[in-house]
């Protein structure tokens, strides 16, 4: 859900940059060295998911997987997503350098919210209903939160002039809700079987 460069005015860009720096600082302070491989894994997944996208108005539609990453990384999604978004700007010109801070906040903030809402439910052995609840919840909050924040930023910056584009951006992400939720459930199931210790060690990222 990258917002394009040249859409937002300077005050919004500066506010996004300041908030992004604050989030990155918190994430780096809480990131432990033994968690770097997991952080890199989710950063790579976020990067790959965002490279397959369809431009829609002043944004784009693509898998986000931010809610899933937030479940396991907490505040560490800010530095993780920063690297992924920066590489997307450099190699594919997605978004832009000026809007990088805003895009980071749009993607990472819902991920942190998903972490606080669902991290306590993560267990190595989870019933199917719990995996569905956490996976779907993370997918909906991640994608829905990103869409809501992107819409809020656009309305704050452009008012009613962006109303139709905001509606288009939200409606076009309905399939992403479904796909992100399915993938999140699958990842939770897989990690519970192959890497169960990670399900018990989310506290340090909070």
From Swiss-Prot:
Principal subcellular localisation of the protein: membrane
Segments crossing the lipid bilayer: 6-26, 38-58, 72-92, 94-114, 136-156, 165-185
Subcellular location(s) per record: Cell membrane
Membrane topology: Multi-pass membrane protein
GO BP term (any one): transition metal ion transport
InterPro entries (alphabetical): CbiM/NikMN
Pfam families, A to Z: CbiM
Gene Ontology cellular component annotations, sorted alphabetically: plasma membrane
Keywords: Cell membrane, Membrane, Transmembrane, Transmembrane helix, Transport
Protein purpose: May be involved in metal transport.
Family, as annotated: Belongs to the CbiM family.
Protein's name in the database: Putative metal transport protein HI_1621
Protein source organism: Haemophilus influenzae (strain ATCC 51907 / DSM 11121 / KW20 / Rd)
């Amino acid at each position: 859900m990258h917002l394009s460069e040249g859409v937002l005015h300077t005050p919004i860009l500066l506010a996004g940059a300041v908030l992004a720096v604050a989030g990155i600082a918190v994430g780096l302070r809480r990131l432990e060295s033994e968690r770097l491989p997991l952080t890199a894994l989710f950063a790579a997944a976020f990067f790959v998911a965002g490279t397959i996208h369809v431009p829609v108005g002043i944004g784009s539609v693509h898998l986000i997987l931010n809610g899933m990453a937030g479940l396991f990384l907490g505040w560490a999604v800010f530095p993780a997503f920063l690297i992924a978004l920066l590489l997307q700007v450099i190699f594919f010109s997605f978004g832009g350098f000026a809007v990088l801070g805003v895009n980071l906040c749009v993607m990472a903030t819902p991920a942190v919210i998903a972490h606080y809402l669902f991290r306590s439910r993560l267990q190595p052995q989870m019933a199917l209903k719990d995996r569905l609840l956490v996976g779907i919840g993370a997918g909906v909050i991640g994608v829905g939160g990103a869409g809501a924040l992107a819409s809020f930023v656009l309305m704050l910056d452009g008012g009613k002039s962006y109303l139709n584009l905001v509606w288009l951006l939200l409606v076009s992400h309905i399939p992403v809700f479904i796909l992100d939720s399915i993938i999140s459930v699958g990842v939770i199931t897989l990690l519970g079987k192959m890497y169960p210790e990670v399900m018990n060690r989310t506290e340090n990222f909070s």
